Amino acid sequence: MHGLLLAAAGLLSLPLHVLAHPQPSTNLAGRGVDLDAYRMADRSSYMSSDDMKLKQPAIASLSGGNYVDTATEVVKRMMPGMTFRMVDDHYVGESGISHVYFRQTMHGMDIDNADFNVNIGKDGKVLSLGHSFYTGPAPDKAPVEKRDFSDPMQAFHGACKALNLPINADKATIQTMNEHEVMFMGTSGAMSDPQGKLCYMAKEDGTLALTWRVETDMGDNWLLSYVDAKETDKVHNVVDYVSHATYQVYKWPIPDPTEGKREIVQNPWNLKTSPFTWISDGKTNYTTTRGNNAIAQANFDGGEDYLNNYRPDSKNLKFEYPYAPNMSPPKSYIDASVTQLFYSANMVHDLYYMLGFTEKAGNFQVNNRGQGGKGNDFVILNAQDGSGTNNANFATPPDGKPGRMRVYIWTKAKPSRDSSFEAGTVIHEYTHGLSNRLCGGPANAGCLNGMESGGMGEGWGDFFATAIRLKPNDNRNSNYVHGEWVNNSPKGNRLYPYSTNLQTNPLVYTSCNKYNEVHAIGTVWCSILYEVLWNLIDKHGKNDGPTPVFENGVPNDGKYLALKLVLDGMAIQPCKPTFVQARDAIIDADMNLTKGSNKCELWKAFAKRGLGVGAKYDPKNRTGSKAVPKECQ
């Protein structure tokens, strides 16, 4: 995340996310604090490829040199006179789109929620851009020169008090890391030493606040708390990084124990996406559930010391352990639980890699084989995590730090059910890692912390989980419920089943006006994407195999094409996107990948659920539209 300070032009933000699976509201685990009240506003703007041609033709035609220089010139022209730095996570995606990310600065310090992303197409010209740069009045002098800010320890105590964090800091000391960053040493209660960073943040009222960004990893919540640097009892916003051989397993796409039997699979990895297999990192070969992509273990006490936790070990690499849904207690089948979790997460890794979530895009791997990105960040998979029940979550720090998935025991059935065995739970949680790493760039894991953008994070998780579980005989009349097995309920844990029937599922874009909770908003987003899925399947057919087949870089069926376009759209859209901006990014992704051959199928799907041409975002009064472009009528 180190970059050059550049004089120039403008947009918005950079953090990590813990996202929980099915909770009705985002509460700070066990402490009664409503984190939704601290969410950042979704304030980014996005210019699609069509917008660029109409409104910024000179910039749209920029080309020549390398893509980084072109992107930098775009920001300079769009935001003249502003200062910014390039974030060190630019890359060329598998679809040929180059993604470059910038952070606005003021007096040599970051404006932590002011980001700019530029997407360069395969032809070297500007495809689209998004930004949230601050354009209000600037402070006269640098606060470091005036020393016009509080001691960081006061801000640390302010964050702990406001969020009721169980951190003991009576003997804490400050270790200075650089001019603007400190570490709080000698504390207890957090999973690692808390950190502080002096930075600006753009407020909703159009002004700029100087803040201490206090980072505290509490396990179920990994928080970036923006504490006012003058009034340390005031917390402006909070970002939560947590979103919330042979293997005997329920083989993909079996979603849960009610729909299939366990079987023994041999060497299930794909050597193109996991060249070291699942049980090696290229340096060490393991005989347990550990490898380059993930490390899985029991975590009965809910603690952070995963390396020393129990995991099954098989010298002959036969991870074959007994399990049946009626077994109890859960600890009696922990080997099977860890093995299933390890299998499912690695399957997700390999599929997402094929679709474009590679090393340079910020995926989760220890050894990146010189392919770009930052390594040393496999996913920590905690089975039967003792820190909670009836839930699951995923912590997504920036690229280079391990992701962490916690899956819990569910007590809504007798005997209790282990969510390691519900593939949809694992896919949903892993997809939080995907969307948080792609949106805003690998170094910025906090771009989905707004209400609508956070809702899309939940919706993407449901969408990938639902698309992956489709059966061979399914058609557009097939309905799917999310989380029915762990919930022991045919209704699952969402408002409605996912369906193309508006009577079965009446949700439309304007339904978001009555919801103020990310899982409800996510259900709306997934309902819209479900229409996209079936429009593309009806046109291109459905590949029922576990992996896509590509022709000239394009999946040759509708299911995997839908997943590919949605994934590419995540990387194209701005930080803290809205439904409208994410829609445009998916359409731009298709323009890049297929030259827009699916434009009308996409528009008709969006319009059916009220996200047509005239749809407009307002957090309290969204405007719906069923209109499509003239050429699609």
Swiss-Prot record:
TM helices/strands, residue ranges: none
InterPro entries from the UniProt entry: FTP_domain, Fungal_virulence_M36, Peptidase_M36, Peptidase_M4/M1_CTD_sf
Glycan-modified residues: 285, 592, 621
CDD domains for the chain: M36
SUPFAM superfamilies in the record: Metalloproteases ('zincins'), catalytic domain
GO CC terms of this entry: extracellular region
Keyword terms: Glycoprotein, Hydrolase, Metal-binding, Metalloprotease, Protease, Secreted, Signal, Virulence, Zinc, Zymogen
Enzyme nomenclature, EC number: 3.4.24.-
Signal peptide: 1-20
Sequence positions that bind Zn(2+): 428, 432
Cofactor note: Binds 1 zinc ion per subunit.
Main localization category: secreted
Cofactor requirement: Zn(2+)
Residue positions of the active site: 429
Compartment annotation: Secreted
UniProt GO BP: proteolysis
Propeptide: 21-244
A Pfam cross-reference name: FTP
GO molecular function: metalloendopeptidase activity; zinc ion binding
Chain's role: Secreted metalloproteinase probably acting as a virulence factor.
Homology family: Belongs to the peptidase M36 family.
PANTHER family: EXTRACELLULAR METALLOPROTEINASE MEP
Protein name: Probable extracellular metalloproteinase 5
Protein species of origin: Arthroderma benhamiae (strain ATCC MYA-4681 / CBS 112371) (Trichophyton mentagrophytes)
